[in-house]
UniProtKB/Swiss-Prot annotation:
The keyword Transmembrane applies. Residues 190-209 are annotated as: Disordered. Belongs to the immunoglobulin superfamily. SIGLEC (sialic acid binding Ig-like lectin) family. One of its GO terms (cellular component) is plasma membrane. It is found in: Cell membrane. It comes from the Eukaryota. CDD domains: IgC2_CD33_d2_like (cd20987), IgV_CD33 (cd05712). This is Sialic acid-binding Ig-like lectin 14. Residues 19-136 form the Ig-like V-type domain. It comes from Homo sapiens (Human). Keywords: Cell adhesion, Cell membrane, Disulfide bond, Glycoprotein, Immunoglobulin domain, Lectin, Membrane, Repeat, Signal, Transmembrane, Transmembrane helix. The keyword GTP-binding does not apply.
Length: 396
């Protein structure tokens, strides 16, 4: 009697443990053409442990197809035919024994767009298609761009490794073909630019130029590319000083070497412009005879103003360049010369005393003339006795 009483309890326990047909999968999945996507999936089905253990087979089918006759898009059953167009691209991932039906779709194609359903088979008792939970796949045009990776900033003369990758791509399907283009790559072997990685030794002239990585999937008309602008750090170069006259029409002189002497007329006004090519921009400062000039005289752009230069304002002028990758300086001698009119000109104070000097000279000359006339007259009368003495000495 006891076994008969326990039988309903055992049946009740078995019924409670009996699973049902359930499928958990995304209803809608979108992937770009040429890329891949992983669709997580899990399932359950009724199965009793005292049954025999035939192999468990799972299948993914195109919607609308008859499971008994149609080719599958993915399965773990080696005896079932797989559609040629999905062979190797649609794959089951995970352990189906652990109820994992995840589907990997690689190298997605436009014709893959559509609905798919999952089916499970085990022996004669389990043959079920989960038609109530279908996967809707949409393949859109490729808009994803490659990623270009490298350590910034690039430094002139220092080799740097660059890599290009396409987000969303996977190993399934034909391999990717990479190609690099850009002015900075001209000295490289053309075969090097066919790899996803390359080593670049940038030059100063490469700063601001474009570098492009193009990715194409072999056998498919799917191409995408990304272009980046190179930021190359380089030490100061082409240091020069240009001299401008305030009332001039252009550059009066361009100094490219140290120690050059530049003559200039006293009273002229100049602008001195110090220029240098570097990245990042260098810090410029002006010195006269080794001493830093007042910041109010200079500007951030390296321009120095010298208004109405005096005779004592010449000397050695130096432009110094400070940069993380190196420093430079350039000097010249400013020789101030008196103008030709300064030899015959006097100051305003001196010009005011000229009338008095002329008056004194004029008075002195008049006095000297008077004294000379008086002296000659006195000598004449003294020696000759005058007119009366001359008449007395005449004979009767």
């Amino acid at each position: 009697m006891l076994p008969l009483l326990l039988l309903p309890l055992l049946w009740g326990g078995s019924l409670q443990e009996k699973p049902v047909y359930e499928l958990q999968v995304q209803k809608s999945v979108t992937v770009q053409e040429g890329l891949c996507v992983l669709v997580p999936c899990s399932f359950s089905y009724p199965w009793r442990s005292w049954y025999s253990s035939p192999p468990l087979y799972v299948y993914w089918f195109r919607d609308g197809e008859i499971p008994y006759y149609a080719e599958v898009v993915a399965t773990n059953n080696p005896d079932r035919r797989v559609k040629p167009e999905t062979q190797g691209r649609f794959r089951l991932l995970g352990d189906v024994q652990k109820k994992n039906c995840s589907l990997s779709i690689g190298d997605a194609r436009m014709e893959d767009t559509g609905s798919y359903f999952f089916r499970v088979e085990r022996g004669r008792d389990v043959k079920y298609s989960y038609q109530q939970n279908k996967l809707n796949l949409e393949v859109t045009a490729l808009i994803e761009k490659p990623d270009i990776h490298f350590l910034e900033p690039l430094e002139s003369g220092r080799p740097t490794r660059l890599s290009c990758s396409l987000p969303g791509s996977c190993e399934a399907g034909p391999p990717l073909t990479f190609s690099w283009t850009g002015n900075a790559l001209s000295p490289l072997d053309p075969e090097t630019t066919r790899s996803s990685e390359l080593t670049l030794t940038p030059r100063p002239e490469d700063h601001g130029t474009n570098l492009t990585c193009q990715v194409k999937r072999q056998g498919a008309q799917v191409t995408t590319e990304r272009t980046v602008q190179l930021n190359v750090s380089y030490a100061p170069q082409n240091l020069a000083i240009s001299i401008f006259f305030r009332n001039g029409t252009g550059t009066a002189l361009r100094i490219l070497s140290n120690g050059m002497s530049v003559p200039i007329q006293e009273g002229q006004s100049l602008f001195l412009a110090c220029t240098v090519d570097s990245n990042p921009p260098a810090s410029l400062s002006w010195f006269r005879e080794g001493k830093a000039l007042n910041p109010s005289q200079t500007s951030m752009s390296g321009t120095l103003e010298l208004p109405n230069i005096g005779a004592r304002e010449g000397g050695e002028f130096t432009c110094r360049v400070q940069h993380p990758l190196g420093s430079q300086h350039l000097s010249f001698i400013l020789s101030v010369q008196r103008s030709s009119s300064s030899c015959i000109c006097v100051t305003e104070k001196q010009q005011g005393s000229w009338p008095l000097v002329l008056t004194l000279i004029r008075g002195a000359l008049m006095g000297a003339g008077f004294l000379l006339t008086y002296g000659l007259t006195w000598i004449y009368y003294t020696r000759c006795g005058g007119p009366q003495q001359s008449r007395a000495e005449r004979p009767g």
